[in-house]
Amino acid sequence: MQKQAELYRGKAKTVYSTENPDLLVLEFRNDTSAGDGARIEQFDRKGMLNNKFNYFIMSKLAEAGIPTQMERLLSDTECLVKKLDMVPVECVVRNRAAGSLVKRLGIEEGIELNPPLFDLFLKNDAMHDPMVNESYCETFGWVSKENLARMKELTYKANDVLKKLFDDAGLILVDFKLEFGLYKGEVVLGDEFSPDGSRLWDKETLEKMDKDRFRQSLGGLIEAYEAVARRLGVQLD
């Protein structure tokens, strides 16, 4: 399957059309951003790491009965995916307090959240992805009540699957975001799951093993991503 025209260039991925109108090529670049794209740097191997990490996670979620857009890997940095009509709202699950939640509520980082929190954010970099709720989604027509309920159900199901997967690898799944779209009327998981869009801590040391290493200038970003992938059994080379 050959990629054709560039359709969209995001902060770390590029989307291309193919000869099949129902399929797209997703290319993972080496770019790493923080502050809604205000700070961007390149790291060798990052595109490959996130592409293969994403394929591994999407495969695990598909095995658990969660519909995903993933079709197959095409190269070290590219995969073939279904073309979705994307919902402009991100779903976030928080198992522990971190990031914006800590700043917003003034609570201690790392406290366990039971049951996990579920948040919605409008995908809009210029507005810094403002938090919204189900009422906003319905009023502004971003997604139907039924499809939003399905997105929430699938997000919690993914959390159940992934918490165990990471726990077995000696990691804490602190929080993560998912994006969904519609494929022939069905709610399907799209975009990606990688350490770029999740927080992962070492279970023993609480060392951060995700993009917070870049956001907080901790260093060792690629080494952390590779360590997480190895623990999970992701085939990299």
Swiss-Prot record:
Keywords: ATP-binding, Ligase, Nucleotide-binding, Purine biosynthesis. Its EC number is 6.3.2.6. It catalyses: 5-amino-1-(5-phospho-D-ribosyl)imidazole-4-carboxylate + L-aspartate + ATP = (2S)-2-[5-amino-1-(5-phospho-beta-D-ribosyl)imidazole-4-carboxamido]succinate + ADP + phosphate + 2 H(+). InterPro entries: SAICAR_synt/ADE2_N, SAICAR_synt_PurC, SAICAR_synth, SAICAR_synthetase, SAICAR_synthetase_CS. GO terms for cellular component: cytosol. GO terms for molecular function: ATP binding; phosphoribosylaminoimidazolesuccinocarboxamide synthase activity. Pathway: Purine metabolism; IMP biosynthesis via de novo pathway; 5-amino-1-(5-phospho-D-ribosyl)imidazole-4-carboxamide from 5-amino-1-(5-phospho-D-ribosyl)imidazole-4-carboxylate: step 1/2. It holds the Pfam family SAICAR_synt. One of its GO terms (biological process) is 'de novo' IMP biosynthetic process. NCBIfam families: purC. PANTHER family: MULTIFUNCTIONAL PROTEIN ADE2, SI:DKEY-6E2.2. This is Phosphoribosylaminoimidazole-succinocarboxamide synthase. It comes from Shigella sonnei (strain Ss046). The gene is purC.
